[in-house]
Amino acid sequence: ELKKKKFDKVFIFNSSLRYFLISKLAGIKKISQYPLFKKKDNIVTSAKIFTENELGTIVSTQAELQLDKLKVTNIKSQFSKDLKHICLGISASGPTKRWSIKNYINLCEKIDKQIPSKFYIAAGKNDKELINEIFKSKIKNKCISFDNLKINETMPIIKNCDLYIGNDTGWLHISSALNIKCLALFMDSPVQAYGKYSKNIETILPEGETEETTTHDTLGAEKISFEKVFNKSIYLLVIFMFLRFICC
């Protein structure tokens, strides 16, 4: 298939010999690739260095998603100004990367008591059991789920949120790219790769771990301090309220 396309050049954001050989067999003459056989690299740093070398200019790792302004404004008009609006990222690529749903429910209840809020549950159809737990809880009437929405339909909603709180998942990175302040819980994935590339992301790590030691196979979900998550959430919401006040 690649050979039929008659590509002139390929950029391979990977150190795999397999991709190099596939490109050669496809007849692609110009092959730009990471150094072969490189292991344990930081995927963000490696991509940045590679891209800068290819383009000959400095590039930012700060992703930015642009949305239709009218759609964002329409959603904003539906948001109550008396509430804080929080995107809650309960989903993840696997159970070891998810904080307990009971913790999230407890967190929502405590936040809402201190700062009246509405929660937007960033999860999909595969997270139905987790979503059901939330909608069986005391906080259910303050929640809206994304499970029946397409990702592009959720973005104007997220864009109007005051804060993202949740696991290291796709919703985190979408929220960050929409310039939303994010509180990300890292328990079984590399902080230095996924939590340091954006000014919008603040992290909570398992007790006893550091940014260097929190990586794949850390298995630290049970060591995420509830009080730290709660206190940091309140702090970020209060800071946001203060900044909005002085800006107005």
Locations of regions flagged by a protein language model:
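Catalytic machinery of carbohydrate-active enzymes
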Residues: E1-C248
